[in-house]
Amino acid sequence: MSVKASTRQSGSVIIIDLSGQIKLGEGTAVLRDAVKDLLGKGYKKILLNLGDVNYIDSITVGELISAFTSVRNQGGELKLLHLTKKVRTVLEITRLYTVFDVRDDEAEAIAAFN
C-alpha cells in the first residue's frame, strides 16, 4: 500500500493527513515534499495526522526528525496526531516519543500551537 497525503487548514494550522505505509522511497518522499512545500509557502504550524499510517521504517523516523528540525529552524512548530499503536511503539523504542509533541485529540493539538 502506497502512502497518501492530503492537507487541510484549521485557522493558522496546516494538517497533513497521511495514510498507508511510509517507508523508504515514495513514502518518505511524500512526507518530505509535503513539509518542504508548506514551509516554502510560509506555513509554520504543521500537524502530522498519522492515524491511518500502518507502518513506518527507520528511514521514516529519520524523515520525521528532519521535518521537525526543518520546521523548528524556520521558527515553526510540528506536532504529531493520532499515532497508531505500531507508530507509537517505534517512537517509544527509539526514545523519540518524548522529542515530539504527540496528541490524541485534534482540537487539543490545534489549540496547543503558540
Give, region by region, the residue ranges found by the protein language model:
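Short beta-strand/loop segment at the start of cytosolic alpha/beta domains
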Residues: 1-17
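Short acidic/polar alpha-helix capping motifs at helix-coil junctions
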Residues: 1-2, 53-55, 106
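Short, flexible active-site-adjacent loop segments at beta-strand->alpha-helix junctions, enriched
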Residues: 11, 20, 84, 106
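Amphipathic alpha-helical interaction surfaces in cytosolic regulatory modules
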Residues: 22-100
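Short acidic-hydrophobic, aromatic-tinged amphipathic segments that line or gate anion-handling sites
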Residues: 101-105
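A short, charged, amphipathic alpha-helix used as a generic interaction element across diverse proteins
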Residues: 113-114
